């Protein structure tokens, strides 16, 4: 894969005027590059509705064919976006079965692909075995914390999670806590942010934690 623009540094926690400007600037760079230099036969947009729907307008005006994989969840919020999809997207590739009927009812060509995580899900975990494996108390309630998969998220929010969990534990001693360990982050990151807790840090078992 040829990486044209790196979006990894555009993540942000909370509201930031800078991120709005950065998104506008990146959108213009991508649109200009695709329409004036690269000129692809097909553009495949993936997720990221607020950003991709904006650049789809420019790309469509340039006569490009556009597919959208994991389109905006118009069934949950901002239903008006389906009009922009109908106008600028040639085909939607959806991951939920009911989305196919929804988009087709608005005259949008749609193909159901299935959810990419379904094939990866293991069999449901046995609760007693899971508790035993990780040294958890079967007589106490388990609270799972999913602090995010990016280092800056943990940097900004870990202290808040820890304080909130400890406050809850003081008020409700029957609670015990587990932290979901994102596979892309090192053990050292979690040791750094959760070293002063007795929380169990568990990697690769999100379904069981849920």
List the predicted regions and their residue ranges:
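Donor-nucleotide binding loops and adjacent catalytic segments primarily
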Residues: 1, 152-210
